Amino acid sequence: MEEQAEGLEELLGTKAPSDVTKKTERREHSTRIIAITSGKGGVGKTNISVNMAIAYAQLGKKVILIDGDLGMANVNVLLNVVPQCNLMHVINKKKTMKEIILDTEFGIKFIAGANGFSKIANLSVEELEYFAKQFSTLGNADIIIIDTGAGIANNVLQFVAAADEVYVVTTPEPTAITDAYGIIKIITTEIVDRPVNLKLLVNRVHSADEGKRISERIITTVGQFLGYKIDYIGFVYEDSAVQASVIRQKPFMIVNPTSKPSTCIKHIVGRSEKSEPLENEGVSNFLKKFLGKKSR
């Protein structure tokens, strides 16, 4: 895959770091790519992904949400849409990227990933060139959020290595805490060729103090045993509004915008916007890094 990544630099024109002009052009509009992951299923990761996407859109951002969970893809259920096409149609040259993007009633665009990302590594040069050019058309978005699979399966590490920021979602449950530490350990020991901008989000808390306490426990353990810095981005309350929105197949940011979970999501997105992220590298570099992830 590293050879593919090198070839991709030529295809997308990203192989000239000394070219100041190209650097300046990329900074004029650089898409921010956020991967949202978790150590285990059932912690509300997909709900967080969907509602964060909507919160960014409500700030006036152009947002694309990609379902990168290759095993249990269900973003479309929360958005109440039925995608007829996915990334595999682009890879097979049956559709363009523009043709598979779904507009939603919530102000965000959606791409069904299916198992498309898992097929990229096996593409021929010609196929990769076509897909790379199609994928680069997503560069007009301000934010791309990728809802990854849970745990380490299904290309999760590739998404994490390629994203500008990575949100690890956990809950106060002991198993979720243990699994959150586990996925952080794997991320920090397997991805060795670049820093990973990790942020911790504690979902389904009953108080702000509980969220802070859980985050401090994980952050302290990560620092002590892994020597890695991870930031606490915030918490989301346990609330009946979340389940009610799932039943209605509408995001809680839409169904109940003044609920506690909605307020929490707005605060998290606001805090993220004010933070100083690592330089966003855009969609072209995302694909190059996705193909060229190095591990121990």
What is the predicted function of each stretch?
Residues M1-G39:
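Extreme N-terminal, non-catalytic leader segments
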Residues I33-M97:
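Walker A/P-loop NTP-binding active-site region of P-loop NTPases
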Residues G68-D142, V192, I247:
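P-loop/Walker-type NTP enzyme "switch/lid" segment
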Residues K133-F135, I177-R194:
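Conserved C-terminal guanine-recognition region of P-loop GTPase G domains, centered on the G4
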Residues Q134-G139, A153-T175:
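Inter-motif core of Ras-like GTPase G domains
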Residues T171-P172, L198-K212, F235-V242, P257:
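G-domain G4 guanine-recognition motif of GTPases
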Residues Q224-M253, C264-H267:
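Beta-strand-loop-alpha "switch" segments that mediate conformational coupling across diverse proteins
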Residues K250-R296:
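NTP-binding/hydrolysis catalytic cores, primarily Walker-type P-loop NTPases
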